[in-house]
UniProtKB/Swiss-Prot annotation:
Range of residues in the leader sequence: none
Gene3D superfamilies, sorted: 2-C-methyl-D-erythritol 2,4-cyclodiphosphate synthase
Protein name, as recorded: 2-C-methyl-D-erythritol 2,4-cyclodiphosphate synthase
Organism of origin: Nocardioides sp. (strain ATCC BAA-499 / JS614)
Pathway(s) served: Isoprenoid biosynthesis; isopentenyl diphosphate biosynthesis via DXP pathway; isopentenyl diphosphate from 1-deoxy-D-xylulose 5-phosphate: step 4/6
UniProt entry keywords in alphabetical sequence: Isoprene biosynthesis, Lyase, Metal-binding
Summary of subunit composition and partner proteins: Homotrimer.
Co-factor(s): a divalent metal cation
Enzyme Commission number, as recorded: 4.6.1.12
Source organism superkingdom: Bacteria
Length: 164
């Protein structure tokens, strides 16, 4: 196995709906009037991080690992998916360097809870996770407030097993 670091990218987007609690970046947002619709808790930040980690390790993507046809993951938290993703990446022979996640949406405003989100996601991954946020200036589904998206990158390095 090549010992050079590998980078992966992941994205996720979910629609905002009434009557669903909002889970985003490993946190519950009890004051938000809408939540994200999905098979699991629809935490787009955690899901994008999972996709980035799977991509970097060459292990497929979120859907091929935790598909909607598998009832075991119905309602699962983003943190649980991220913990299992990190376990699978490490089991495949990789160390996780870091993950960077950018959330795109009008709500919630992440600034006041950024450190808390980074702590929650880092704990799930077992490696540093940074979180940033932006809006889409009124453009597209995130700009119109119809949903929230996230983009993530991950750095993994193959573990060296003995000398050549």
């Amino acid at each position: 196995m090549d010992l050079l670091p590998r980078v992966g990218i992941g994205t996720d987007v979910h629609r905002l709906v009434d009557g669903v609690p909002l889970h985003l970046a490993g946190l519950h947002w009890p004051d938000e009037p809408q939540g994200l619709e999905g098979h699991s808790d629809a935490d787009v930040a955690a899901h994008a991080a999972c996709d980035a980690l799977f991509s970097a390790a060459g292990l497929g993507d979120l859907g091929s690992n935790f598909g909607t046809a598998d009832p075991a993951w119905a309602g699962a938290s983003g943190a649980a998916l991220l913990e299992e993703t990190a376990r699978r990446v490490r089991a495949a022979g990789f160390e996780i360097g870091n993950v960077a996640v950018q959330v795109i949406g009008n709500r919630p405003r992440l600034g006041g809870r950024r450190a808390e989100a980074e702590t929650a996601l880092s704990a799930a991954v077992g490696a540093p996770v940074s979180v940033s946020a932006t809006t889409a200036d009124g453009l597209g589904l995130t700009g119109r407030g119809e949903g929230v998206a996230a983009i993530a990158t991950a750095l993994v390095t193959p573990r060296h097993h003995g000398s050549a």
